[in-house]
């Protein structure tokens, strides 16, 4: 920055005042500033620009599958277009993110129908459509689907399956988080062990699982770690080693 220039730190972005002397040192989140000297950073980050703080986050909706568990309900329509309160499910998901987020739609089954709907229902949003070459049978699933959009997700992002329904707005993609819901049947779901608000273990469809089920919604801040951990068609494989995050 040059002499006389300034920037505004948005509310809640300032963490604390470090010291007040002739010079005021403040800890702030400043993606507007390229040249930063970090003194005693809590996360051990070095000085200088942090690339992903300058990237526009994205919302990735996984809508490639045929929706077989819905049986006749998805016979003629993509499951993400099924109505909920007079609006398609994917519209509820899109509306829960800031308008400047890119929306990456990973498509397969009834893909053209979904494209047409998105363009008409959300003309002000920037969509990137990714078509999955294989969305039925073996070696398919959300892990495989999201891998097809990898080049568009080299930045913090939120991913969600097209049939996920939540009532609250999504948290921002400026930290790693998972969407959870209580369950008494862990053998049917991927479940997590939560301690002090943090995930300390993850099990996939085990009778020895935990009390909170993963609902197919997550915020990915450490996207490089996510891609390194992801294996095969099971997207939850990216979270088996939670200590990596």
Where are each of the predicted segments found?
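Short acidic-glycine-tyrosine-enriched beta hairpin
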Residues: 1-16
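Active-site metal-binding loops of divalent metal-dependent hydrolases
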Residues: 13, 66, 163-164
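Double-stranded beta-helix
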Residues: 16-55
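Short beta-strand/turn micro-motifs composed of small residues
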Residues: 29, 63, 107, 161, ...
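Conserved N-terminal catalytic core of the sugar/cofactor nucleotidyltransferase
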Residues: 55-61, 69, 83, 87-156
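Short beta-strand-to-loop acidic/aromatic patch adjacent to the donor-nucleotide binding site
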Residues: 155-165
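Conserved core of the sugar-phosphate nucleotidyltransferase
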Residues: 166-237
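An accessory alpha-helical subdomain
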Residues: 237-244
